[in-house]
């Protein structure tokens, strides 16, 4: 009797188990970097550490021809489109590249480009809210991007910014659409597996699939599609609102030039952030009273919900942004 195709619950449990172990590996690697190099280096290189952790996890399992821990947990194996042979080394390599490496490359390319397009072309400083922890260093690629975006006209910048926004949001919506489609049809859970044609077969025999669970998954897929449509509408509305606010800000920019120069001189006397060791930008207070940059402390709290100085525990929503604080 030929092995049966893996059911959607088995595929989802395998993916969740893999995500659990990948998260543990990321946390351990990030903690080691933080202990050895400090908080500033951890903030600067945490994305690269996460990438290396994912590549190591899939390199020791999928690339090596073994089951991942999640696949082993539910007893399923990967097969190529023939459903007879396991995927070749090339196909597995493409799978890991699409699943782990490509999202990192897209994020590293599109996010800095969006920040440069949002930046004031006259002063070269990004607008409020567009800074990130990794955006303070000026790498060669970032300088090249800044040089070429500076030569664009205002109309070209708006058009390119709109295209970047559509691409970033489109990729996120495509991922959500793909998951909803999986709930309905139950074949490919990850987009990378659809592109490479890799599916799952069940190794051990299990009782028949519950039809009620299958109907529930299809209903969940329909609800996910409706939620996706609503989210896309809200994101488009928010983008237009931000574009309108940015246009108004630039129209009134010249009237407040003198005030801005005075504020810049005042900012230059700001104390340092203890996380990045640079001038504190957008001061934010923790419940215990310590002050940090908004970008630094939010990035810190995304992995450790505690104060970096006194280690007092608190949820991220307790952070207090100090507007107009000097």
Curated annotation (Swiss-Prot):
Residues engaged in binding Zn(2+) 1: 273, 276, 293, 296
Domain of life of the organism encoding this protein: Eukaryota
Listed GO biological process terms: cellular response to reactive oxygen species; peroxisome organization; proteasome-mediated ubiquitin-dependent protein catabolic process; protein import into peroxisome matrix; protein import into peroxisome matrix, receptor recycling; protein import into peroxisome matrix, substrate release; protein polyubiquitination; protein quality control for misfolded or incompletely synthesized proteins
Zn finger spans (RING-type): 273-311
Subunit structure: Component of the PEX2-PEX10-PEX12 retrotranslocation channel, composed of PEX2, PEX10 and PEX12. Interacts with PEX19.
Cytoplasmic side: 38, 123-147, 237-326
Subcellular location(s) per record: Peroxisome membrane
Protein name stated in the entry: Peroxisome biogenesis factor 10
Reactions it catalyzes: S-ubiquitinyl-[E2 ubiquitin-conjugating enzyme]-L-cysteine + [acceptor protein]-L-lysine = [E2 ubiquitin-conjugating enzyme]-L-cysteine + N(6)-ubiquitinyl-[acceptor protein]-L-lysine
Lineage, opening ranks: Eukaryota, Metazoa, Chordata, Craniata, Vertebrata
């Amino acid at each position: 009797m030929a092995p049966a195709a893996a059911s959607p619950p088995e595929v989802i449990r395998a993916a969740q188990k893999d995500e659990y172990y990948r998260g543990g590996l990321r946390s351990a690697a990030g903690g080691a970097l933080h202990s050895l190099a400090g908080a500033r280096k951890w903030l600067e290189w945490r994305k690269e550490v996460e990438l290396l952790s994912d590549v190591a996890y899939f390199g020791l399992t999928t690339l090596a021809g073994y089951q991942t821990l999640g696949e082993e947990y539910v007893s399923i194996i990967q097969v190529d489109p023939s459903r007879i042979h396991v995927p070749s080394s090339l196909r597995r390599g493409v799978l890991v590249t699409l699943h782990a490496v490509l999202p990192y490359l897209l994020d590293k390319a599109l996010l800095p480009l969006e920040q440069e397009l949002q930046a004031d072309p006259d002063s070269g400083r990004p607008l409020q809210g567009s800074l990130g922890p990794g955006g303070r260093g000026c790498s060669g690629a970032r300088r090249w991007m800044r040089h070429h975006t500076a030569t664009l006209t205002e109309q070209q910048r708006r058009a390119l910014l709109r295209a970047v926004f559509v691409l970033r949001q489109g990729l996120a919506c495509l991922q959500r659409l793909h998951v909803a489609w999986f709930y309905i049809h139950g074949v490919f859970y990850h987009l990378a597996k659809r592109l490479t044609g890799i599916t799952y077969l069940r190794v051990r025999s299990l009782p028949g699939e519950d039809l009620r669970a299958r109907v529930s998954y299809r209903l969940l897929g329909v609800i996910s599609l409706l939620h996706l449509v609503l989210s896309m509408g809200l994101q488009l509305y928010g983008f237009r609102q931000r574009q309108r606010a940015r246009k108004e800000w630039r129209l009134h920019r010249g009237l407040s030039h003198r005030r801005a120069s005075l504020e810049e001189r005042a900012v230059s006397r700001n104390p340092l952030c203890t996380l990045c060791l640079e001038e504190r930008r957008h001061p934010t207070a923790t419940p215990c009273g310590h002050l940090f940059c908004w970008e630094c402390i939010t990035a810190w709290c995304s992995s450790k919900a505690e104060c970096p100085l006194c280690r007092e525990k608190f949820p991220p929503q307790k952070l207090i942004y100090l507007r107009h604080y000097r």
